[in-house]
């Protein structure tokens, strides 16, 4: 689809020329990789290759097709691979991006030394070293595919036209799998000047499946009665499994490990059978037309059911209901009818069931034969078609007596192309972990089904024009067609799916595939008690009521967000145009998710909020609340000295309570909350803070303060040991961080505890960022010696920094105050994907403080840690207050938890 190829990045956009000047290259040596039969498969080194080490899925969706990021990629690389089938061309291409953080920054070097980081730099948001994009074309429109490749210069060794004045043709080799590798070889040579090297289809299929199942967290899903449920696969427990590829025929492959697989069975009754017989019997001209017919069918008009044999009764003695199919097409035997007397819709449905049920049964029997626990289905016949998946799922469920489930893959259409891509030497995908992949969905994802229409869009102006074109034409979001509930749904030898027809979709666009960004600097937060069972989202958006509520909240907040974003850039005509385009794009995302919650993978509130921020950045609103944050920071810094003086006059016990009250009171400042936005219109930031603090009365709705106080101050004359290092996850700018979290950090520093302030890598609403914190700390340090000395020790004050290795200047009584980025740009945080710097800082930490609704309530409220945890937040949403803590809006949470053993 036009406009889906690239996404805006605020750091990278102005750095393209520097990117093209990278001089790193990788020598391509030739290798031999063993095939399953023992015959070596030659892996060509004739074309430059990708270094996909530490790749990550982040970013842009090509509608249904994702992109992957390769951080360690050199310039001399392969840029694409294809799977050319009889009906579709699947193209996977690489786009290069680099991280441009300044490793010579003195402040960052100092913090890096303190954290013991020896490699890499301190920029912790995903390093956009590269992305893998997934695109598809219809095979009979191959010239459109070639035009796309040519327009993006993917066939050249250096695809970046700004890096040199003249670009030689890429006379190397492109890896291709599928039958079209032979058919179109001459056309590729003629049009693009490149040669095609064909890769074994089955090897590519297995390689692609292995990568997806290990590297993408929510890749596999089940599909029963129209409901999708994503399945978490443990990469260490993946093998062996059964891969069933349903194309024209069916191949059943037993996969035992990387490069270890065997075709153990198959059948000639597959997608080609359905299409061929269906075309003869119904006169349909296309596979999709035949599938559409099945939506309206009633197979009881053609299939012989158990009830037809036993007078409408069940055969209960052997467990068969009256609606069970006894014989596919069996009713046609006894009826004196010609072909024209039967409805094409009924024929299509009966044929679809007959073939799908048999594929499901044969697959299960092979899994049983080899003692396999998992069956994954893919191929042209599946194509994300909901009714086909439901039918196969019921077959596997029935024959296994509920002990096994059929599973499907979100990216299953690209297994071959991905495998061909991985056949290049030094492709680097082998070491990729799921926490290093981020999938993002660009503006066009809700509008089309993944096809490319015309040339790729070159810049933001073209993207906006594309959006405006849809509005002018009144184009609706492309939506899967709801199925009519079937009158009878008999299964061959087993029960029928219940008639949840309205939940079933007729086309493959029910699931979108995004752009996979490879981010090497993301890691799993090492202090999680059990990363395998960790679920960041507190609210279950699989619940329809919850999902509809939060989608509505985001929709209602959209006008205010657009106004703020446009105002942040001076209200220019350009800003207004981009604001309108953002509103349309994000509204389309919300509508898509309202219709199909699983369209972008497993849906959680954290994903929704991050999607909004990514959409803002796509339309170049880098920091919509910049001016608001600056104003609130200045106002808060002005009253900070009085607050610190007040705190210093208190006893230790009173001060600790006041500090926690201050954090909770200051957390009221949240531009993501409708209730709080209303408050902003009625008073100044200081007035609101004082009002909030005056209303602080214990007990709070969740009140573990006494336990926390005992841990901090001890009891019965017993002095507790001090914390070694505290990680403080901060939330909003202004009063929240300056009057709330900084005084709390100061208290820990006073006690000799190292403090690491953890903040967003990229802006999100009015959340403070790690880039902004040093200036805020510097402003606060002017009024406080404790903060000044700690900031100097932590490398935050550039003009007065202490060299950590300089013993003569080092104040042994001062604990350092440091700042690290968390690796994300969202109001929430998924601790399965944090920056490498945060992971390094966590290794010596024995206290985690999560502050704010996004990080402590929407996500991580139920998270358990290997160390102590303190979760502090004011609830600024009535529904969340009722659901989560059985309270009311503006109730407070102070949750202290000892280490989870």
UniProtKB/Swiss-Prot annotation:
Pathway: Cofactor biosynthesis; coenzyme A biosynthesis; CoA from (R)-pantothenate: step 1/5. Disulfide bonds: none annotated. It comes from the Eukaryota. Transmembrane segments: none annotated. Its EC number is 2.7.1.33, 3.1.3.-. Residues 1-466 are annotated as: Pantothenate kinase. Residues 467-901 are annotated as: 4'-phosphopantetheine phosphatase. It catalyses: (R)-pantothenate + ATP = (R)-4'-phosphopantothenate + ADP + H(+); (R)-4'-phosphopantothenate + H2O = (R)-pantothenate + phosphate; (R)-4'-phosphopantetheine + H2O = (R)-pantetheine + phosphate; (R)-4'-phosphopantetheine sulfonate + H2O = (R)-pantetheine sulfonate + phosphate. Gene3D superfamilies: 3.30.420.40, 3.30.420.510, AF1104-like, Uncharacterised protein PF01937, DUF89, domain 2, Uncharacterised protein PF01937, DUF89, domain 3. This is Pantothenate kinase 2. The keyword Metal-binding applies. Highly expressed in leaves and developing seeds. Expressed in roots, stems and flowers. GO terms for molecular function: ATP binding; hydrolase activity; metal ion binding; pantothenate kinase activity. Pfam families: ARMT1-like_dom, Fumble. In the N-terminal section; belongs to the type II pantothenate kinase family. It comes from Arabidopsis thaliana. Residues 1-10 have a biased composition (Acidic residues). Phosphatase activity is strongly promoted by several divalent cation ions but it is suggested s that Mn(2+) and possibly Ni(2+) represent biologically relevant metal ion cofactors for damage-control phosphatases. Subfamily II proteins have an EGMGR motif about 50 residues from the C-terminus. This motif lies near the metal-binding residues in the putative substrate-binding cleft 2. Subfamily II proteins occur only in eukaryotes, in two forms: as a stand-alone unit in plants, and as a C-terminal domain of pantothenate kinases in plants, animals, and chytrid fungi. Activity is strongly promoted by Co(2+), Ni(2+) and Mn(2+). Activity is inhibited by EDTA.
């Amino acid at each position: 689809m036009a406009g889906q190829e690239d996404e805006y990045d605020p750091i990278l956009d102005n750095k393209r020329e520097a990117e093209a000047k990278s001089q790193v290259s990788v020598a391509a040596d030739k290798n031999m990789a063993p095939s399953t039969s023992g015959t070596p498969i030659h892996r060509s080194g004739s074309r430059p290759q990708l270094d996909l080490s530490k790749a990550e899925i982040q970013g842009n969706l090509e509608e249904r097709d994702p992109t992957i990021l390769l951080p360690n990629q050199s310039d001399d690389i392969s840029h694409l691979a294809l799977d050319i089938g009889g009906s579709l061309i699947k193209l996977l291409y690489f786009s290069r991006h680099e991280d441009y953080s300044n490793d010579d920054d003195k402040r960052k070097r100092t913090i890096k030394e303190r954290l013991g980081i020896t490699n890499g730099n301190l920029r912790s948001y995903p390093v956009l070293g590269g992305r893998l994009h997934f695109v598809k074309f219809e095979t009979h429109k191959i010239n459109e595919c070639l035009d796309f490749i040519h327009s993006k210069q993917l066939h050249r060794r250096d695809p970046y036209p700004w890096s040199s004045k003249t670009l030689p043709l890429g006379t190397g080799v492109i890896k291709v799998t599928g039958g079209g590798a032979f058919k179109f070889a001459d056309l590729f040579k003629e049009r693009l000047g490149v040669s095609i090297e064909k890769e074994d289809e089955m090897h590519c299929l297995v390689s692609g499946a292995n990568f997806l199942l290990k590297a993408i967290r929510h890749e596999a899903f089940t599909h029963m009665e129209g409901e999708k449920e994503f399945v978490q696969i443990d990469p260490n427990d993946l093998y062996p499994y059964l891969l069933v590829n349903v194309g024209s025929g069916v191949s059943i492959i037993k996969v035992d490990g990387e490069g270890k697989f065997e075709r153990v069975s198959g059948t000639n009754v597959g997608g080609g059978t359905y299409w061929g017989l269906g075309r003869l019997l119904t006169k349909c001209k296309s596979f999709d037309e035949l599938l559409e017919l099945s939506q309206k069918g009633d197979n009881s008009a053609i299939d012989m059911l158990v009830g037809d044999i036993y007078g409408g009764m069940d055969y209960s003695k052997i467990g068969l209901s009256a609606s069970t199919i006894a014989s596919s097409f069996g009713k046609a035997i006894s009826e004196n009818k010609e072909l024209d007397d039967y409805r094409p819709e009924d024929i299509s449905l009966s044929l679809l069931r007959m073939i799908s049920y048999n594929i499901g049964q044969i697959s299960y029997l092979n899994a049983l034969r080899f003692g396999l626990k998992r069956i994954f289905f893919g191929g042209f016949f599946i194509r994300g078609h909901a009714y086909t998946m439901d039918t196969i799922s019921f077959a596997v469920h029935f024959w296994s007596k509920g002990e096994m489930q059929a599973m499907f893959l979100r990216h299953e259409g690209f297994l071959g192309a991905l495998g061909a891509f991985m056949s290049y030497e030094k492709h680097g995908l082998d070491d990729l972990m799921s926490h290093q992949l981020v999938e993002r969905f660009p503006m066009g994802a809700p509008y089309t089904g993944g096809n490319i229409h015309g040339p790729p869009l070159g810049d933001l102006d073209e993207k906006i024009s594309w959006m405006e074109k849809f509005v002018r034409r009144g184009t609706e979001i492309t939506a899967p067609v709801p199925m009519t509930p079937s009158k009878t749904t008999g299964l061959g030898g087993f029960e029928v799916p219940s008639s949840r027809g309205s939940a079933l979709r007729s086309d493959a666009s029910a699931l979108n595939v995004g752009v996979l960004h490879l981010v090497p600097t993301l890691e799993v937060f090492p202090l999680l008690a059990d990363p395998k069972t960790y679920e960041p989202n507190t609210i279950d958006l699989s619940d329809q009521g919850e999902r509809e509520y939060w989608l509505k909240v985001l929709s209602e907040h959209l006008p205010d967000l657009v106004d703020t974003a446009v105002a942040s850039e001076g209200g220019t005509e350009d800003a207004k145009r981009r604001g309108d385009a953002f509103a349309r794009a994000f509204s389309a995302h919300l509508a898509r998710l309202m219709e199909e919650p699983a369209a972008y993978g497993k849906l959680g509130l954290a994903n929704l909020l991050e999607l909004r921020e990514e959409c803002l950045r796509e339309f170049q609103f880098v920091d919509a609340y910049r001016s608001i944050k600056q104003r609130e920071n200045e106002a808060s810094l002005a009253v900070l000295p009085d607050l610190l003086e007040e705190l210093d006059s208190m006893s230790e016990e009173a001060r600790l309570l006041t500090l926690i009250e201050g954090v909770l009171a200051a957390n009221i400042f949240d531009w993501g909350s409708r209730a709080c936005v209303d408050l902003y219109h009625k008073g100044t930031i200081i007035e609101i803070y004082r009002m909030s603090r005056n209303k602080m009365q214990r007990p709070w709705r969740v009140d573990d303060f006494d336990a926390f106080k005992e841990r901090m101050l001890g009891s019965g004359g017993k002095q507790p040991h001090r914390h070694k290092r505290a990680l403080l996850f901060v939330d909003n700018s202004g009063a929240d961080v300056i009057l709330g979290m900084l005084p709390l950090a100061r208290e820990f520093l006073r006690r000799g505890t190292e403090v690491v302030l953890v903040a967003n890598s990229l802006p999100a609403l009015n959340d403070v960022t790690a880039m902004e914190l040093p200036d805020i700390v510097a402003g606060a340090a002017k009024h406080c010696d404790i903060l000044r000395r700690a900031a100097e020790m932590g490398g935050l004050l550039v003009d007065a920094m202490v060299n950590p290795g300089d013993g003569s200047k080092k104040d042994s009584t001062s604990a350092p105050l440091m700042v690290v980025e968390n690796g994300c740009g969202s109001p929430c945080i998924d601790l399965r994907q944090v920056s490498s710097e945060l992971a390094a800082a966590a290794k010596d930490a024995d206290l985690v403080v999560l502050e704010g609704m996004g990080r402590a309530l929407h996500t991580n409220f139920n998270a358990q840690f290997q160390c102590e945890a303190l979760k502090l937040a004011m609830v600024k949403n009535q529904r969340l207050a009722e659901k989560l803590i059985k309270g009311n809006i503006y109730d407070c949470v102070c949750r202290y938890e000892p280490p989870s053993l």
